[in-house]
Amino acid sequence: IQSNVIHQAYVHQVKKLLFLGSSCIYPKMAPQPLKEEYLLTGLLEPTNEPYAIAKIAGIKMCDAYRSQYGCNFISVMPTNLYGPNDNYDLNNSHVLPALLRKFITAKNSGAPSVNMWGTGSPKREFLHADDLAAACVYLMQTYDAEGLVNIGVGEDISILELAQLVQKIVGYEGTIQTDPSKPDGTPRKLMDVSKLAALGWKAQISLEEGIQRVYEEIKDKDWR
């Protein structure tokens, strides 16, 4: 799909195209925080490899069309996203919506504790979807160069601290139970956003404010 879209953007002389990538394009063992120049400097995370390769192909295709045909195609790499209309299915949701559902359900049912996988020590970065949209619009208006641009907040938080923040926002008074027998995953995943900052953009929605917004939208859901 992406190859057809990029090619047809060239054929129909689209003035500008923004390709949306993913932070999984970076090597599994890349230094933290992740800088744009770390692309293709090492092996990818095996579980994400096919998806990551497709995204990398899109980035390189945009750069090639820029080089060969002068197309104004740019690429951006967002960090972990959250916000309205997220997926709350505990079988396949991401960590933040899963925690929100767990704490809301526990509060409503009066459960004494909420269980979470692993030790809670891994760190992750979270960007509100509205901030991503604002960054993309800004870059469409101001950025006209090859290569990619990371979009994130430049700060991370441990999963346990995230759970405690969600607990506070939801108003759940029980306890949090970690399960060290379950896998923790990658220890840290943080985007270097110095390039984006130098271009004049910074995220506006704090993590606490963003989670509060989401909570207000979903707090009355009847999950059973």
Residue map of PLM features:
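C-terminal substrate-binding subdomain of Rossmann-fold SDR/epimerase-dehydratase oxidoreductases
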Residues: T105-R224
